[in-house]
Design a protein with these regions (language model features):
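Condensing-enzyme catalytic core mediating Claisen C-C bond formation in acyl metabolism
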Residues: 15-19, 43-46, 227-304, 312-313
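Short, well-ordered amphipathic alpha-helical segments that serve as non-catalytic structural scaffolds
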Residues: 88-99, 156, 183, 256, ...
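Conserved small-residue
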Residues: 20, 38, 92, 116, ...
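Phosphate/pyrophosphate-binding loops at sites that engage ATP/ADP/AMP, CoA/4′-phosphopantetheine
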Residues: 95-110, 260-267, 296-313, 335-339
């Protein structure tokens, strides 16, 4: 056993299981439709004109949600929430029901043992921009009184907390594109430390706005393959040239194993470890060689009491940027060394686009599903793996995972140098 991998959680720490899953993405408005479309090679990317009706066209590639969350929630609730919070509510409601609570408010009892953690990247930015436009064109008297609540980064978390009556803590990590994964790391800590029996955790984002898209374009982060929307985002591909933005949410019900067993809950999988690091290299570029990512994966494995040889699957962050994908691949080579070819790697952002603060949570749901169904999801747009990547990347068809106990890692990275890795195991 490598000395960098210890024995996992300390004696007496409580195990965490996943009892509920929720998704809303460009492939579907819930978990079954999204998972089915992903395994079938679906892609939610399209050309979208974000321009004003009377103004010039502002056409970008994007992966808008398949289902408008405002049509799922009550009209009153939708009117009082930013779109990012709407996504969070829709996905959280599905996750809570999937966990065996038909009425979300019945989850909490008196609420003292239930917590919520929802990560965001840009949060209510689009609502802020809408209100700024109203201020400039109609005057201060037309600005919504909800402007301040919906612009706060904790808006989505607060709305989910209200829905389930959480009183053990409502938190909102803001760590760019690693925020959804960091939310799950916090949830694991709360379960282990005994601060909560149930944590509704995940990430959400609704930032498809021309200002955001123009900003990423100026950073040269977006794919310029406008004539081929379905093939534009190509994680790990030799011809990758940037990502496509998406929107949506992923939410999980993370529960202490003892609490889940006591109520006879179905268990989808186990959240066994988390690692959080920072590159401290550059605000918008990964450190060469991916040392921060490697350290996060090492930390997650150590936290889970695993060695690299026990991992069969990785759901990679893989945004399809030339530097980002290469650095992540180098990090995985560093961790798994000679055994890297035995690890089946999925890169799914070609289907969903990059959902920023929601990405880590959406991909955590996919990782749990992959272990549950023993199926690694495909990369819908992959044509040829970059030889410099050198990973066993799943192509355009799903890949079967081996028999026996399964364990996986999901990686997330974000501007500011954030790195988060989560370790999962199957329900057995």
């Amino acid at each position: 056993m490598s000395p960098r991998h210890a024995a996992g959680p300390a004696p007496g720490e409580r195990a965490a299981v996943v009892t509920g899953l929720g998704l809303t993405t460009s492939l579907g408005g819930d978990v079954p439709s999204t998972w089915r479309a992903l395994l079938d090679g679906g892609c939610g990317v399209e050309r979208v004109d974000f321009g004003e009706p009377a103004g010039p066209a502002q056409v970008y590639l994007a992966a808008p949600a398949a289902v408008d969350p405002g049509t799922v929630l009550s009209s009153a609730k939708a009117a009082h929430c930013d779109r990012s919070a709407q996504f969070a509510l829709v996905a959280a409601r599905e996750a809570v029901r999937d966990a065996g609570f038909p009425d979300p408010s019945a989850l909490a009892g008196d609420g003292s043992r239930v917590a919520v953690v929802v990560g965001v990247g840009l949060g209510g930015l689009t609502s802020v921009l809408e209100q700024d436009h109203r201020l400039r064109t109609q005057g201060a008297g037309r600005v919504s009184p909800r402007t301040i609540p919906v612009m706060l980064p904790n808006h989505a978390a607060a709305e989910v907390g209200l829905m389930v009556g959480a009183k053990a803590g409502v938190h909102a990590p803001v760590s760019a594109c690693a925020a959804g994964a960091e939310a799950l790391a916090q949830a694991l800590g709360m379960i282990r430390d005994g601060r909560a029996d149930i944590v509704v955790a995940g990430g959400t984002e609704a930032a498809l706005h021309p200002l955001v898209l123009a900003g990423f374009a100026r950073l040269r982060a977006l794919s310029r393959r406008h004539d081929d929307p379905k093939g534009a985002s190509r994680p790990f591909d030799a011809d990758r040239d940037g990502f496509v933005m998406g929107e949506g949410a992923g939410m999980l019900v993370v529960e202490s194993a003892a609490h889940a067993a006591a109520r006879g809950a179905r268990v989808h999988g186990r959240l066994t470890g988390a690692g959080i690091t920072n590159d401290s290299h550059h605000v918008a570029q990964p450190a060469p060689g991916g040392p921060g990512c490697a350290a996060a994966v090492d930390a997650a494995l150590r936290d889970a009491g695993l060695v690299p040889e026990q991992i069969q699957h990785v759901n990679a962050h893989a945004t399809a940027t030339p530097l980002g994908d290469l650095g992540e691949a180098q990090a995985l080579h560093s961790v798994f060394a000679k055994g890297v070819d035995d690890v089946t790697v999925s890169a799914t952002k070609g289907a969903f686009g990059h959902t920023l603060g929601a990405a880590g949570a959406i991909e955590a749901v996919l990782t749990v599903l992959a272990l549950r169904d023993r199926t690694a999801p495909p990369a819908c747009s992959l044509e040829r793996v970059d030889p410099a990547i050198g990973l066993n990347v799943v192509g355009r068809d799903p890949a079967a995972l081996p028999c026996g106990p399964l364990a996986a890692v999901s990686t997330s990275m974000g501007f500011g140098g954030h790195n988060v890795a989560l370790a999962f195991a199957d329900a057995s």
